[in-house]
Amino acid sequence: MNKKLKVMTVLGTRPEIIRLSEVIKKLDQYFNHTLVHTGQNYDHELNQIFFHDLGLKKPDIFLEVSTSSALESIGQIISKIEIHLDTIKPDAFLVLGDTNSCLAAIAAKKKKIPIFHMEAGNRCFDQRVPEETNRKIVDHISDINLTYSDIARDYLLSEGMPPDRVIRTGSPISEVLQAHNTEISESMILETLSLTKFSYYLVSLHREENVDSKENIQKIGELLNAISAKFNLPVLVSLHPRTKKSLTLNKVKLDKNILLHKPFGFIDYIALQINSKATLSDSGTINEESSILNFPALNLRNAHERPEGMEEAAVMMTGLSLSKIMQGLKILASQQRADSRTIYPVKDYSYNNVSEKIPRIILSYIDYVNSNLWKK
């Protein structure tokens, strides 16, 4: 028979869309592939523009999950995906990362569908971070865990995962950046915003632990104003709705040199990072992107889940400490760019064939999971 395997992929946030973009194209090519969007943040700025920028088809299914509360969203994700699992009956189920969307895997587990989890094994060891709980749950219910690094693989093995079900694939982000290199280099976003290369700071902050408390959002306002005052340069802030809401609610006052902007598309945001004097972010992707593209960056978190990035010191971690941020920016000012780089790329972030690996792994392990775990 020439029947194609049925694979279902679930996503719901920008990082998932970006990282999965090249994988999705391969899954569309080789399998009967269903792409499900949980509806978490599906609007033009947060999601739709990324599908356009990355050349992806519109999702086949929208769960239209409410985001009124995290627990309500999680409940809806699990209950709504169940309907489509029963209808489509996929042979395999793929998720990436640690967002609430990944918890759709709980429904797949109940249906005894083989679960493949990309970006498995990441740990920040900070229980205040909501994603830490998510990633532990998804790792431990997944059948095949696909890690970016040996460190992540070792974490899973130390937690009792069977070695034959943990596979290091490397990060998919380098392949995505390479696929869109021409578009990134041709971006006109600096001209559009009247910015000069290496003469502005780029900031992106959205994590719950950073922006949801009054104390921290006030700190963020103070550090933005301090950077603007010290260097007399524009500070461009890519404004996530969560951050915008907190700034408004807490009446944070910002200097005129602080430029608040709605979230950028993938192409323009990468171009802004490359051409910034430095990028300050609490994003999970900052370690990888700064390592691959060699732009100066600070990670504004107190804990992170990518220690392999620190082995090459690709990014410095400062939290929201103004004194550490200022010292960090001073160090970054001497960072060599382009071919003269002295901060070397992290090997685990440099793979350009992850999208080829994933379909092969899925094809190889569906029967293995069914026979060895579910005794089908």
What function would you assign to each model-found segment?
Residues 8-11, 16-26, 30, 50, ...:
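Active-site and donor-binding regions of nucleotide-sugar-utilizing enzymes
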Residues 29-59:
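N-terminal glycine-rich anion-binding loop in soluble enzyme alpha/beta folds
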Residues 40-43, 48, 185-275:
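Donor-nucleotide binding loops and adjacent catalytic segments primarily
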Residues 40-45, 64, 141-216, 318:
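A nucleotide-sugar donor-handling region in carbohydrate enzymes
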Residues 81, 85, 271-276:
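Short alpha-helical donor nucleotide-sugar binding micro-motif in glycosyltransferases
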Residues 95-96, 102, 117-118, 145, ...:
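A donor-sugar binding/catalytic signature common to diverse glycosyltransferases
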Residues 336-376:
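C-terminal amphipathic helix plus adjacent low-complexity
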